[in-house]
Amino acid sequence: MERIKELRDLMSQSRTREILTKTTVDHMAIIKKYTSGRQEKNPALRMKWMMAMKYPITADKRIMEMIPERNEQGQTLWSKTNDAGSDRVMVSPLAVTWWNRNGPTTSTVHYPKVYKTYFEKVERLKHGTFGPVHFRNQVKIRRRVDINPGHADLSAKEAQDVIMEVVFPNEVGARILTSESQLTITKEKKEELQDCKIAPLMVAYMLERELVRKTRFLPVAGGTSSVYIEVLHLTQGTCWEQMYTPGGEVKNDDVDQSLIIAARNIVRRATVSADPLASLLEMCHSTQIGGIRMVDILRQNPTEEQAVDICKAAMGLRISSSFSFGGFTFKRTSGSSVKKEEEVLTGNLQTLKIRVHEGYEEFTMVGRRATAILRKATRRLIQLIVSGRDEQSIAEAIIVAMVFSQEDCMIKAVRGDLNFVNRANQRLNPMHQLLRHFQKDAKVLFQSWGIEPIDNVMGMIGILPDMTPSTEMSLRGVRVSKMGVDEYSSTERVVVSIDRFLRVRDQRGNVLLSPEEVSETQGTEKLTITYSSSMMWEINGPESVLVNTYQWIIRNWETVKIQWSQDPTMLYNKMEFEPFQSLVPKAARGQYSGFVRTLFQQMRDVLGTFDTVQIIKLLPFAAAPPEQSRMQFSSLTVNVRGSGMRILVRGNSPVFNYNKATKRLTVLGKDAGALREDPDEGTAGVESAVLRGFLILGKEDKRYGPALSINELSNLAKGEKANVLIGQGDVVLVMKRKRDSSILTDSQTATKRIRMAIN
């Protein structure tokens, strides 16, 4: 206070003011500070005093021809004096105003194309809705977020090649445009930017914004998709938040969201198949998201989510080194441990074999709605500091940490038997057994954990076994904090391996991910996901399985027909018939299969009983392991639309309806495709069925005697040739194969050769 008073007194004297405003600064140190180096030391001040001058701007001499010396008000726009040290002209700020109003205009057609991301942002903000402001403590945690809405997902190198090709097509330098997205974007941009007058460097910079994902590590409470991050400064402060609904969506957020849904569906489906890893890869390779191959998206998209990372690991891509447990991402921040197998007894005296982590370790735990810091020793929780959005989220984090600690009191808190199974009906591993048990009900766990008195520490409070806050007592070692725990910021990726049950391990053998960690949350994808794999037919329910199965048979009828006559077992084992089995009542599967297989065998043996439509209709039923029985059926039941519906063995039904006139099949009223059969439908199938073991050599050859009927063929010796009468009175030359085993590829040509021989 004294000093301020003294200064006030000084300033009231006119001499002081004169010294401060008029005296030159001639102290060498000060002059040095402000004049050494090219870097401006006080840009704001410099700008202020420059703009106070009459001519603060320099311009090329050509400006004198383009701008009048004075404006309409008679103010001078440029000075005839040269800028010291260059041959440029000194110009007034008023010249800029004149130029903006009266200067030359250019075509603006390219602006929305080049500055696309800005124009789109304006649209999103225009149509967005801002809600009320709430004042409350904000638990923000730093997360790696996408700050650039509306981008493609090219790598920096790929984008660089595209930009060079679009903006500087004549520059020297090897550019290899390989990926589909690179080629599409290049073509599109070249067309859009023809005759563009905007500075190439600006175009290049804007293209980069459009092509590459930019991420930052920012404190966020709430939505993390890029359309929320672009308004982060408007929606959350230190003690307030403003509700906001974006006025539009962007492709990159939609891709991220749809990728997660597709990956979860695929992992869930793969888990229940005979070879999960092979199935997962088959599905990833045959799935498209928004018209782009899922494997291409996986290679480029940095989204970290359990199911997505399992798919990446299966493709041999690197993933983050953090591991997942109970839906939380764990990252070890210090300490180390060795793993030992140990047998423990639950409160129900059930023996569990668990892999115990021996040693002191510290972890950060990050989930969607809660975060925590965990310090633990061998089978002991030392400290857990947790923060979350609400009581429920905090409880979830505490349960996961307690189970992860492997403490004895947690294992003893188990009541009843642990027999949780996964989707494939296999028992879960012991740690996940415990987790599921306590996620269902953690009362006993919290009650038997123990409580302790707590010190008063700023920003921390205790939490009681019933999950209510307290300032006096808390669950042993557990505290609730107002501050969130930041997500692990590193973008480092490590090489991992994956086994056939989709367990992902790092190079030390630690399990980072397993299908148990994949969220069961269902969502609706923003982009169309097209699963071409038969394994995904059931995702849309029983009807979809039925329609897809029959569509598949019709699409592949040529091959199916030959296999049906030559190698039925191989046909019955096709994975495309797997989903169908879930529609057939369990008790009837074997009987139906036995019945249909017998029927098919009769068709193969007895001439003229071949019936294309009937084979198509009954084929899926033959895929189950058959039971030998004498049972006959006039209709077969399938479970769709919540009840059993009948497929008639002979004739049409609402489930399976074949229209002879249009040759189209409808399944449950949905079109399942058209049969492309020969005009004499049925006979071509018979020929290839009956001519099994014979090679069709061509047209009739009189040297081999008169035409035999198909029935007389059986008398030929191996290697012997004969003319044979088929179908509508046509004659072809055949030879009996020298080997008994009929080869599939030979017979695939049978039908074609009959046609060629006849024509």
Swiss-Prot record:
GO biological process, alphabetically ordered: 7-methylguanosine mRNA capping; cap snatching; DNA-templated transcription; symbiont-mediated suppression of host gene expression; symbiont-mediated suppression of host mRNA transcription via inhibition of RNA polymerase II activity; viral RNA genome replication
Lineage top rank: taxon: Viruses
Keyword match Membrane: no
Record site feature (Avian adaptation), residues: E627
GO molecular function: RNA binding; RNA-directed RNA polymerase activity
Cellular compartments per GO CC: host cell nucleus; virion component
Short sequence motif named Nuclear localization signal, residue ranges: 736-739
Subcellular location: Virion; Host nucleus
A matching Pfam family: Flu_PB2_1st
Keywords from the named record: Cap snatching, Eukaryotic host gene expression shutoff by virus, Eukaryotic host transcription shutoff by virus, Host gene expression shutoff by virus, Host nucleus, Host-virus interaction, Inhibition of host RNA polymerase II by virus, mRNA capping, mRNA processing, Viral transcription, Virion
Family label: Belongs to the influenza viruses PB2 family.
Functional description taken from the UniProt entry: Plays an essential role in transcription initiation and cap-stealing mechanism, in which cellular capped pre-mRNAs are used to generate primers for viral transcription. Recognizes and binds the 7-methylguanosine-containing cap of the target pre-RNA which is subsequently cleaved after 10-13 nucleotides by the viral protein PA. Plays a role in the initiation of the viral genome replication and modulates the activity of the ribonucleoprotein (RNP) complex.
Subunit structure: Influenza RNA polymerase is composed of three subunits: PB1, PB2 and PA. Interacts (via N-terminus) with PB1 (via C-terminus). Interacts with nucleoprotein NP (via N-terminus).
Protein name: Polymerase basic protein 2
The organism of origin for this protein: Influenza A virus (strain A/Grey teal/Australia/2/1979 H4N4)
